[in-house]
Regions:
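Bacterial Sec-dependent N-terminal signal peptides
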Residues: 1-22
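Beta-propeller-forming repeat regions
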Residues: 20-652
Length: 652
C-alpha cells in the first residue's frame, strides 16, 4: 500500500492536465459592447516574462508563461488602451528548445533591436534569441554561475554601455520544513503555541556584470548585492525599469504580494542600492490582489514608463505609475484588471459558480467564488434562452470587496498559503425572507453566512457570520461547497465532516444547525470524498442538491478534484475510472427528500464521453438556459473558465 501511495503522489505531482479541447467550444465568452473584457490567464496562474515593441507597434507586446499544469509561453500583441488600461489580442504560441522546456524562470527583453530570453537552469544562465518568423526562441549562449550555495530562481538582465548586468534571486538555503500534506497523516503545521513548525524562508539578490562580447566567458562569479532576508518566500519576478525622470532600477514582486524597488547604483562594485518599497498614493505599501505577484513595466508609444503589469494566481492586473514620494519610493495607482479582446468569461482560478437571479430581473446571473477569496457577480445582460454574461463585479460588504484570506494560522497547509481564500459560495434564501443569501466555506474550513439585508432586486450583504453546531462555530473540511436546499419541509446542509465523509445537517434557525448523520449509499456504506483522507487532500468537493433526473426527489451533483474517490478509495470515482481529471458526479437519491439514500455515483458525460477538468477541482451549477425541459449544466474549472453543456447532450 505504501508503495502504491508513493506512486500516486509522484503521478499527481507531475500531472499536467488532460486535454479539454473536445469541449473548448463550450467555453462561455464574456459579453461586452466593444468586445473588450478582463484578460483570462492561460492556466491556474501565470508569469509575465517581459514586454517588447514589435515592428510598427504603438505599445509593447507581452510574453506570458503559463504554469506547470498547462506549460506554454505565449505572445500577446497590445491593441491599445481602454480607459488607460492595456488590452491585448489573441495569444500566439511560442516554441522553446526542447532541452529548456516552458517552465524555467526567465526574463525577456530587447537588446540592440533583437528580442532575447534569459533563463535560469540550475546554476547556469542560458541566453536565447527570438525568431519572429517561426515564433521560437533558439539557444545562443550559456554561462556557468559560480559563488552560489543554492541555485538562483528569478532573474533580470539588461544591457548598458556594452555590458550585461544580471540580478539573481538567491534563497537563504533553508527549507520550508513543514509537513507535506499528501504524506503526513497527522499533519501538524503548527506547534502547541500556535507557531508554524517549519521555516519562514527568505531571499535576497546576487549579481554580476560581464562584457557583452560575441563569446561569453565559461563562468562568472555572482556576488551579493543584498543580505538574504529581503523578501519572504521569494521575489517571484525581477524586472528592470526606466522611469520618465531617467531613474533606473528593478521592481520585484513577492509571494505575499508586496512589491520591492531597488534603484540602480551606477557603481560596478554594487549594482543596486538598498531596498525601497512600492507604495500607493497614500504612501502605504501596495499589497497585490493575489498571491505570487510578478511585475513587469509597461511603456507608452514614446517609451515612457506609464505603469506595471502584474500576474499571479487568478488574474493579471495593471497599475498606473504616479511618480515618487519623498523617500524615493515609486508610487502606483489602484490596480485594475488587464484587458483582452474577445476574451473568455473569466472568474479567477478554481471558480465555484452559482446560477441564480441575483438582481431580480427575471434571468439567471452567476455568483462565483474563486481561489483569490473574492465573490463576484456576473450579470446576464441577455436572457435565459440567449444568456450574455458581463464581466465580473466584486460583491462588497459595506463598500469593501469580499476578500477571504486565511492569514498566518487558518490554512491547514501553513502560513505560506495565507493568501489563498478558496471561497466556495452557495446561494440560497437561507432565512426564508424572499432574498438570496450567500453561504460559504473556504480555505479555513469555516462555514459562514452573508445575509442579504437589501430588498428584492437590490441585494445588500451584511458582514459574514458563523454558523453554529451545538453552540460551537461549525467547522468542516476545507474548500468544499456546501450543498444547501430544502429537503421536504426542512433546509438541509450537506458538507464533508472530520472523517472526510458526506454529512447531513438540518437548519434550526438562521445561525444554527443540528446533526442529521452521515449520508449513506443504498448498500449502507458511508460516502467518502478523497483518496487522501488527511491534510490538504481532504474536502474540495463542490456539492449541489438538485433534482437532476426530474423524478421529484432531490439528488446530488458533485464536482470533484482529480483524485476524488467517491464513495471509497478502492472503487470510487473519478480517480478509479482512468485518472483523467476532475469530474462531475451524479448521485441519484433512491430514498426520499426526508430520508435521502444514494445510488453509486455516475460520471456525467457530454456526447457520450465523460467530462474532465484538470487537477484541483471543478464546480457544477445548473439552470434552465437553452433548454426549457430539464436542467442545463455549467461547470467552472481551475483555469477560471465556464463550460456550458446543453441538457440534450448530457448522459450518465
Amino acid at each position: 500500500m505504501k508503495k502504491n501511495l508513493l506512486f500516486l503522489i509522484l503521478v499527481i505531482n507531475t500531472f499536467t492536465g488532460y486535454s479539454q479541447k473536445a469541449y473548448n467550444n463550450n467555453i462561455i465568452k464574456c459579453f461586452s459592447e466593444d468586445s473588450i473584457s478582463s484578460f483570462a490567464l492561460p492556466g491556474v496562474n501565470a508569469t509575465v516574462l517581459g514586454s517588447v515593441f514589435a515592428e510598427k507597434s504603438k505599445y509593447p507586446s507581452m510574453f506570458l508563461q503559463s504554469d506547470n499544469w498547462y506549460p506554454a509561453i505565449y505572445l500577446y500583441e497590445c491593441m491599445g488602451l481602454k480607459n488607460g488600461v492595456p488590452y491585448y489580442d489573441d495569444p500566439v504560441s511560442i516554441s522553446m528548445p526542447s532541452e529548456l522546456g516552458y517552465s524555467l524562470n526567465g526574463d525577456i527583453l530587447e537588446i540592440d533591436g533583437a528580442v532575447y530570453g534569459f533563463w535560469i537552469k540550475g546554476k547556469q544562465l542560458i541566453e536565447t534569441r527570438y525568431n519572429e518568423d517561426d515564433k521560437s526562441f533558439e539557444q545562443t549562449r550559456l554561462l556557468n554561475i559560480e559563488g552560489l550555495d543554492v541555485s538562483p530562481s528569478a532573474v533580470s538582465v539588461w544591457k548598458e554601455r556594452g555590458k550585461l548586468y544580471c540580478l539573481l534571486e538567491v534563497g537563504d538555503g533553508k527549507k520550508i520544513g513543514g509537513p507535506v500534506h499528501w504524506e503526513n497523516k497527522d499533519f501538524p503545521p503548527y506547534d502547541s503555541r500556535g507557531f508554524f513548525v517549519g521555516n519562514l524562508v527568505y531571499s535576497g539578490l546576487y549579481g554580476f556584470i560581464i562584457e557583452d562580447n560575441d563569446v561569453w566567458p565559461i563562468s562568472v562569479k555572482a556576488v551579493p548585492q543584498t543580505d538574504l532576508k529581503q523578501v519572504m518566500w521569494g521575489y517571484k519576478k525581477i524586472s528592470y525599469v526606466t522611469y520618465p525622470n531617467g531613474e533606473k532600477g528593478v521592481i520585484t514582486g513577492s509571494h505575499n504580494g508586496n512589491f520591492l524597488y531597488y534603484p540602480i547604483s551606477g557603481h560596478e562594485d554594487r549594482i543596486v542600492e538598498n531596498r525601497r518599497f512600492v507604495v500607493d498614493e497614500n504612501d502605504i505599501l501596495i499589497r497585490h490582489n493575489t498571491i505570487w505577484a510578478r511585475p513587469i513595466p509597461f511603456y507608452n508609444d514614446v517609451n515612457d514608463h506609464i505603469g506595471m503589469i502584474v500576474s499571479g494566481e487568478g488574474g493579471i492586473y495593471y497599475y498606473p505609475f504616479a511618480g515618487f514620494n519623498k523617500q524615493g519610493n515609486p508610487i502606483y495607482g489602484k490596480s485594475r484588471p488587464l484587458l483582452a479582446h474577445q476574451s473568455d468569461l473569466y472568474g479567477g482560478s478554481l471558480i465555484v459558480p452559482n446560477l441564480v437571479d441575483w438582481d431580480g430581473d427575471g434571468d439567471l446571473d452567476m455568483i462565483v467564488g474563486n481561489s483569490i477569496g473574492n465573490i463576484n457577480f456576473f450579470e446576464n445582460e441577455g436572457s435565459n434562452s440567449d444568456p450574455k454574461f458581463k464581466d465580473a463585479v466584486p460583491l462588497c460588504v459595506y463598500g469593501k470587496p469580499i476578500h477571504i484570506q486565511p492569514g498566518y494560522k487558518d490554512d491547514i497547509q501553513g502560513p505560506q498559503e495565507s493568501r489563498w481564500g478558496y471561497v466556495c459560495p452557495t446561494v440560497v434564501d437561507w432565512n426564508n425572507d424572499g432574498l438570496l443569501d450567500i453561504i460559504t466555506n473556504d480555505s479555513r474550513g469555516k462555514h459562514r453566512i452573508f445575509l442579504n439585508i437589501g430588498e428584492k432586486g437590490k441585494p445588500v450583504l451584511d458582514s459574514e457570520s458563523p454558523l453554529y453546531l451545538d453552540g460551537l462555530e461549525f467547522h468542516g473540511t476545507w474548500r468544499t461547497r456546501p450543498g444547501v436546499a430544502r429537503l421536504g419541509e426542512r433546509m438541509a446542509y450537506i458538507t464533508q465532516d472530520e472523517d472526510d465523509e458526506f454529512h447531513l445537517y438540518w437548519q434550526i434557525d438562521t445561525y444554527n444547525l443540528e446533526d442529521g448523520g452521515k449520508l449513506k449509499l443504498t448498500d449502507g456504506s458511508f460516502i467518502g470524498g478523497s483518496y487522501f483522507g488527511k491534510g490538504g487532500g481532504t474536502g474540495r468537493n463542490k456539492i449541489l442538491i438538485i433534482d437532476w433526473d426530474d423524478d421529484g426527489v432531490k439528488d446530488l451533483l458533485v464536482g470533484t478534484p482529480r483524485y476524488g474517490t467517491i464513495p471509497n478509495k478502492q472503487i470510487g470515482l473519478p480517480f478509479n475510472a482512468g485518472d483523467k481529471g476532475a469530474a462531475v458526479l451524479f448521485l441519484r437519491n433512491a430514498g426520499t427528500n426526508n430520508e435521502p439514500v444514494y445510488d453509486f455515483p455516475k460520471m456525467i458525460k457530454y456526447l457520450g464521453k465523460t467530462i474532465h477538468f484538470g487537477q484541483h477541482s471543478c464546480a457544477p451549477t445548473v439552470g434552465n438556459l437553452k433548454t426549457k425541459d430539464g436542467l442545463d449544466l455549467i461547470v467552472g474549472d481551475q483555469k477560471g473558465r465556464f463550460y456550458f453543456f446543453e441538457r440534450k447532450d448530457l448522459s450518465w
